[in-house]
Amino acid sequence: MANKPGERKLQILQTVAQMLEQPKGEKITTAALAARLELSEAALYRHFASKAQMFEGLIEFIEQTVFGLINKITQEEKSGLQQTEAIVSMLLGFAQKNRGMTRVLTGDALVNEDERLQRRINQMLDRIEATLKQSLRMAATQGEVNATAEVGAHANLLVCYVTGRWQQFAKSGFTRDPLAQWPAQSAILLGK
């Protein structure tokens, strides 16, 4: 059982993530969550003021993980094109390893929840797009991609690709692996 401060909070977030991994994609209710944890709903509200706060905790985990990995990629990889490929691959792999989080990233789990949650996901996707744009700009100066190509449009296309693969994965009940065709598709998307 969770004894230390913060341990119960983490247990609640992990349980929400596990519930989101169910292929049927049922709505998460505090009653169902409390039952799964063998707690009262009141006990849940001692740790989180609202269900929206629980989703904010999951989004915070996603942001910390994704941007931590992006920072590592951009620091270690000197090629702009390799940065771009590694970031897209990481985003697809993150979904593959964190199925429940994929439903948060696609907004599927946020339907009928506080709209600020979807805004936060949108802001995260905008930050990812800006990072891809920087990597593509670097690739253009390094002669790895066409220097006259519109890097903003290219970065947007890559984000659309990633979110589309996330959607396919979530909507298929997690059977369509987001990385399944990535090697062939990366050659098309990155002009390799």
What feature does the model see in each segment?
Residues 1-36, 53, 65:
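Basic, helix-initiating cap at the start of DNA-binding domains
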Residues 38-48:
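Short hydrophobic/aromatic patch on the recognition helix
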